[in-house]
Regions:
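Left-handed beta-helix
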Residues: 193-386, 393-395, 400-409, 438, ...
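Short, well-ordered alpha-helical scaffold segment located
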Residues: 58, 109, 190-191, 263, ...
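Conserved N-terminal catalytic core of the sugar/cofactor nucleotidyltransferase
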Residues: 1-5, 13-20, 28-104, 110-112, ...
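Catalytic metal- and UDP-sugar-binding loop of GT-A-like glycosyltransferases, i.e.
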Residues: 6, 105, 387, 432
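Conserved core of the sugar-phosphate nucleotidyltransferase
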Residues: 113-217, 221-227, 247
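Structural motif
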Residues: 148, 155, 311-312, 372, ...
């Protein structure tokens, strides 16, 4: 089964933890993993390939975070002009064979419970019979932020957009209403045929768009020009509301849509809870993501406080969602705070801003294994690099040399330079830039005659082939069981399976 992950959200709802350049689906939320990574981990037992649909500007973040999965088969579908879930799901599904099962999930949900497996297995049974299947969640409370569906047993009667529940007295939990989780399971051909019959415009424009793109490694880019004729809208509005005989599986697992900061746990990976002190507070939530700051609250109630290195958000819990309007109304003046955070992903690694003031800027630079910066130079600043982790292969002018931990190098203004990582571990450098102008635009890339100026130029060949390390891809901790065959679908003639080992040719495999 293939898994299409929708990961194109903009990040306003969780400000200041998430920003436009680093939205919530990429934040470390649980056990050091982001919501995107948690979504992948959750579905690895059921899916053999992942198709991640996201904005073009998030390409480097996705590829950077997917390096955590060294033997995983995945593809990134980039939307130059996002048009809603209908286009995203159609474009992603076109990369699957028509007979293959496709499981659509979103990258901003938290899910717990063994019942997740049961829901997927039941949905697969229905999908194999030709149905498009939604996963519905029994409402725990009235919530105007979610879409609903009305069902009769496993039959979907209608989809309902987000509604003002206080204004709709006819709504009742006993009437067969379920939250629409945004998760769907179907055979690729069944969805494509439904689109052709119900919304020919969506079918035709998505099919033409796919014909116009070229795959580079595992990345497919649909430019704004290619996507301009694709209709805007949700998959529910354009297809599912008009679909006959759609099925739904009511789920019993714990499901949480991370819609605002109140949906987070104060003790999650995003917060340093040891640096929070509450005194005489009632129903107060404090999330402190700044590891060098103490947050103290005193004699307040029904309030949420979110503290980061460069911004603080304080709101009543009732009005916490107002942040979207606040950002929209004040974006021009405070764009740097609303849109950007201190971490930025590149094709070759990560930049993290540590400190900045007039005349200097300090960054932590991480270069991924087997990656290299482009050769470049700066006209307005000099740089001082200190290697604090790994072995960096640094080019200065015409000279290339390896620098080890605790060794440093000075890069004068105008000097051509780059860093490459020819090892199988991250290289970490502390970079200090000095100059009157420290803009990211002060960079002149220098390509070789053989270069085509694409991200492919950022790959280097390792000096030594790394040792291949293998671990069980699937493991049944209860030795003597049949879980690997009955649950994960492993093909094996033995009655008892303890471990299953998989060999991968994935370029990041170890």
């Amino acid at each position: 089964m293939k898994c299409v992950i929708l990961a194109g959200g903009s990040g306003d709802s969780l400000w200041p933890l998430s920003r436009k350049n680093y939205p919530k689906q990429f934040m470390n939320i649980k056990e050091g993993r982001s919501l995107l990574q948690e979504t992948v981990v959750r579905n690895m037992p059921f899916c053999d390939e992942f198709i991640i649909v996201t904005k073009e500007s998030y390409r480097n973040i996705v590829n950077g975070q997917m390096k955590a999965f060294q033997s995983l088969k995945y593809r990134v579908v980039l939307e130059g002009s996002p048009k809603g879930t209908a286009a995203a799901i159609m474009l992603g599904s076109q990369f699957c064979n028509q007979s293959e099962l496709v499981f659509v999930v979103t990258a901003d949900n938290l899910i717990e419970g063994q019942e997740y497996k049961d829901a997927i297995l039941r949905a697969k049974e229905l999908a194999k019979q030709g149905s498009i299947v939604a996963l519905g969640v029994k409402p725990a409370k009235k919530n105007s932020n979610f879409g609903y569906l009305l069902r009769d047993e496993e039959n979907v009667l209608k989809f309902i957009e987000k509604i003002r529940l206080d204004d709709d007295e006819s709504f009742g939990y006993d009437d067969g209403f379920l939250w629409n989780s945004g998760m769907f399971l179907y055979r690729a051909g069944d969805l494509i045929n439904a689109a052709r019959a119900i919304c020919p415009e969506l079918y035709d424009t998505c099919r033409m768009a796919k014909r116009k793109v070229a795959a580079i490694r595992r990345t497919v880019r649909f430019s704004q020009k290619i996507m301009k004729d694709i209709p805007q809208g949700s998959i529910e509005r354009l297809i599912f509301e008009k679909l006959k005989d759609m099925k739904v599986v009511e789920t019993a697992f714990r499901w949480k849509d991370v819609g605002n900061v109140c949906d987070l746990d104060e003790n999650s990976s995003v917060s340093h809870s040891e640096n929070v002190l509450k005194n005489h507070c009632e129903d107060v939530m404090v999330i402190n993501s700044a590891d060098r700051q103490l947050v103290v609250t005193n004699d307040i109630q029904d309030v949420v406080v979110v503290n980061t290195e460069d911004a603080v958000y304080v709101s009543s819990k009732e009005r916490v969602d107002d942040i979207k309007n606040i950002i929209s109304e004040n974006k021009e003046k405070y764009e740097n705070y609303f849109d950007y955070n201190r971490i930025s992903y590149r094709e070759w690694g990560i930049h993290e801003l540590l400190n900045a003031s007039d005349g200097y800027k300090v960054k932590k630079v991480t270069v991924f294994p087997g990656m290299s910066m482009n050769l470049h130079q700066h006209e307005m600043r000099s740089e001082h690099w200190s290697v604090v982790e790994g072995t960096a292969t640094i080019t200065l002018g015409t000279e290339t040399k390896d620098y080890h931990k605790y060794e440093s190098v000075f890069v004068p203004i105008g000097m051509k330079h780059k860093v490459a990582n020819k090892t199988d571990k991250n290289v970490v450098i502390i970079e200090v830039g000095i100059g009157e102008i420290l803009s990211e635009s002060d960079m002149v890339k220098i390509y070789s005659q053989e270069s085509d100026g694409t991200a492919e130029d950022n790959y280097v060949k390792a000096a030594n082939e790394p040792v291949v390390k293998l671990d069980p891809a699937f493991k049944d901790n209860l030795w003597g069981g049949t879980k690997l065959r009955t649950v994960f679908g492993k093909k094996c003639d033995y009655d008892v399976i303890g471990e299953s080992w998989e060999l991968s040719a994935h370029p990041d495999g170890q």
